[in-house]
Amino acid sequence: MGAGAWGTALAKVLVDAGGPGTEVTLWARRPELAERINATRSNPDYLPGTSLPPGIHATADAGEALRDATTVLLGVPAQAMRANLERWAPLLRDGATLVSLAKGIELGTLMRMSQVIVSVTGVDPAQVAVISGPNLASEIAACQPAATVVACSDSGRAVALQRMLNSGYFRPYTNSDVVGTEIGGACKNVIALACGMAAGVGLGENTAAAIITRGLAEIMRLGIALGAKGATLAGLAGVGDLVATCSSPHSRNRSLGERLGRGATIGSVLAGSPDGGDGHVVEGVTSCQSVLALAASYDVEMPLTDAVHRVCHKGLSVDEAMALLLGRRTKPE
């Protein structure tokens, strides 16, 4: 449910993993995009250059997409999850496994995506799974080797999803720690913005390494306060996702941060302006607000997240944010 880059890439993975005869329905919000995907076997809007297998059928009709579906992958942006689910909930089959692909914390409620799914649909939390990891859609669509985490409190559902996704190039690992898997995914986008900002003002690898490492410390503090396992955040859904998103030129969050570091304004970048924006969703811009609020509610200190929030929403320059961080009181690691 969602024909963006990640939703489209995972639809391809499912068909490739399932082999001949496997069929996946891909819901697109815009009818013209669904028609284009079916006609051209490609998604030029979100995943240009990728040939899609014939087992993928796109539709803009949610009823058609969800009819008799026993596994539903929810690939809409985090802040749009609730509104979409409110429309889709009556169409869901009883007992279906609902899988969140979104990485973010809902503004206002400060809920993780699995909590939003349960809140809206009323399903048993054991029916809800999360897929998260170092998964840049363009690389996976190109069949480059990658790994991910399938987290669910129901081990049977986790293993079933693992089998559905296990292809020659995409390797899923199961995990019962839904909280840790979601926190790693939500927070890493914020740290990637910080890495991009540093690169944009011309800072080098030492700075990037410090941001990634201290960013991980923030993520660990928040995750553990929420009941996550440290091992989860040291794995693919934590360190793995953080490194990929902070380092890759394909990362929208890092790229946006880099443009901010070069002097673009947040408004112009998000609007898809000549400053370099592409108009696609960049979760970290919203996540820095909701993650910071969630951390405050648990009395967890997250200075990097706070600095990113100040740049994105309070008008602070990147240079001023760096000075603020470097001026903090020194302390043991």
Curated annotation (Swiss-Prot):
Annotated positions binding sn-glycerol 3-phosphate: 103, 133, 188, 241, 251-253
Disulfide cross-links: none
Reactions performed catalytically: sn-glycerol 3-phosphate + NAD(+) = dihydroxyacetone phosphate + NADH + H(+); sn-glycerol 3-phosphate + NADP(+) = dihydroxyacetone phosphate + NADPH + H(+)
Binding annotation for NADPH: 6, 29-30, 103, 137, 252, 281, 283
Record GO biological process: carbohydrate metabolic process; glycerol-3-phosphate biosynthetic process; glycerol-3-phosphate catabolic process; glycerophospholipid metabolic process; phospholipid biosynthetic process
Keywords (A to Z) from UniProt: Cytoplasm, Lipid biosynthesis, Lipid metabolism, NAD, NADP, Nucleotide-binding, Oxidoreductase, Phospholipid biosynthesis, Phospholipid metabolism
PANTHER family: GLYCEROL-3-PHOSPHATE DEHYDROGENASE, GLYCEROL-3-PHOSPHATE DEHYDROGENASE [NAD(+)] 2, CHLOROPLASTIC
Function text: Catalyzes the reduction of the glycolytic intermediate dihydroxyacetone phosphate (DHAP) to sn-glycerol 3-phosphate (G3P), the key precursor for phospholipid synthesis.
Family (UniProt): Belongs to the NAD-dependent glycerol-3-phosphate dehydrogenase family.
Protein's name in the database: Glycerol-3-phosphate dehydrogenase [NAD(P)+] 1
Organism classification: Bacteria, Bacillati, Actinomycetota, Actinomycetes, Mycobacteriales
